[in-house]
Amino acid sequence: MTLISGSIRERSRIVQEKGTPISVTIREKESSAPLAQADVGPSLTRYEGNWYFDPATVKADVLRVTERTYTCPQKGTCNWVDYVGPDGRTVKDVAWVYPQVNPGHEVIQGRYGFYAGSKGTTKEEN
């Protein structure tokens, strides 16, 4: 497995130009537990530098949408998502979800957002 760092946008463009779909897996850093996996396309989109996964592609058994929120002046208010491992260990803010979005950002509504690359508590693999 390869950890992607640097210009994921450039790498995604090159891979897609060759006709091979790019698959992205997001993992919790400490345990390497998978949090989400999908191929770029209808189930996975890159938006403003972050990955947004369709809810069907995330590991709902280890992800908990919280009441904690953040309000982006452009996109609207999102809820933070925590990782809860099988041992009960909780890692805060591994992802976020916008239940409703401001006009112009509908593509991310209801999707789970993760930072691209390796940042904070998650890491990206392809």
What are these regions (language model features)?
Residues M1-N126:
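Terminal leader/tail segments of proteins
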